[in-house]
């Protein structure tokens, strides 16, 4: 779950990196399986599968793992999955959106509600938090794609809305309805020279909520718990945490 724009520091979690990587691989493999089951095994004909494979390759999921996940989606008797969004408020009044893909809605709802209630949060109704977020396309490219100016020019020509660049990479934002077209245009521009690290629809906060101290500690704990739930695919929040506070939370 990479993210380096100002609002996305919430995606840098405490914890053992090996464990986080294993959780990430499992989550990406699951998304490939679900996409394969819902839309077929051919990424050329299945946009969701194509994006899932792009994101898996972006964090070096082995090709064999990707193929096994595709095949699993095509096997008979597999579970049926539903995509569900949960919204709530965490410690310090931070808004949180949780996207889940589950074969058991009751289990998912119970686990997510418990993660909120045991960590100073309250699970709300659909729409109770998301009005404070914009749903956008986010396409991440490595620094090797070019300079900030070069990527900005390519993104504008492709129809993107905004670009954020730093020493870690480039994040290109699009309107949700333009996501596929911009992704294709950028792929044509960069060709085989460089591939995106990730490409997905995200929830980006319109406004952020400053948080520090005990509330920040509790929020990080809640987000860690949510991240590790099997049914959870993505977690977004609108916390604003200073660099010094992030260093403290990370043990730095």
Swiss-Prot record:
It comes from the Bacteria. InterPro entries: Integrase-like_N (IPR017856), TACO1_YebC-like_2nd/3rd_dom (IPR048300), TACO1_YebC_N (IPR049083), Transcrip_reg_TACO1-like (IPR002876), Transcrip_reg_TACO1-like_dom3 (IPR026564), YebC-like (IPR029072). The keyword Lipid biosynthesis does not apply. It holds the Pfam family Transcrip_reg. It is found in: Cytoplasm. The keyword Chaperone does not apply. GO terms for molecular function: DNA binding. Keywords: Cytoplasm, DNA-binding, Transcription, Transcription regulation. One of its GO terms (biological process) is regulation of DNA-templated transcription. GO terms for cellular component: cytosol. Its main location: cytoplasm. Belongs to the TACO1 family. This is Probable transcriptional regulatory protein HNE_0161. It comes from Hyphomonas neptunium (strain ATCC 15444).
